[in-house]
Amino acid sequence: MKGEQRMSLDGIRIGFCMTGSFCTFEKAFAVTERLVQQGAKLVPIMSFNAASISTRFGTAEENIKRLETIAGCKVIRTIEEAEPIGPKKMCDIMVVAPCTSNTAAKLALGLTDTPATMAVKSHLRNARPVVIAISTNDALAGCAKNIGYLQNLRNYYFVPYAQDNCEKKPNSIVAEFELIPETIQSALDGIQLQPVIRVK
């Protein structure tokens, strides 16, 4: 019932889409493990960059394998594979974590040129919720208008976020990844988890 917090994610089909904020991949993987432990069924998705770029945070192959191991199925890595998500009603909710400024900009403009943005677009055709876990160094600069735009759209919900290093990176914002399960629970009931802006 709307307004009542769900105690479990058992049986909930969660599209979990990772984009290229590689420094937060470890947090994202930890969340996917929690979601599976809570009974959720994951539909894993990666943007082109997330699935192809190797960094000090892991090789592309390692990251793909890790997500597939947690989810128990193959990662969706192409636009063609992502397109049926909506028509087949594959997900009850879509999570983009981490969501880069590039992905946020494309979502705000309705661009669907990556598996991530196609997954969200296809999912939204069913008027089902999308949860954004923003992670970008320009959240309070160039990306601010896109974050604000998405927050004002129906069916979009944001994981609460905070400045991660206000002295050295004053424009940087990172979502509180540990709040993703709670944000999902609220979004499934049509409620934005509050407060959205957190202070560390």
Language model region names:
Residues 2-130, 135-200:
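A cross-family phosphate/adenosyl-ligand binding-site feature
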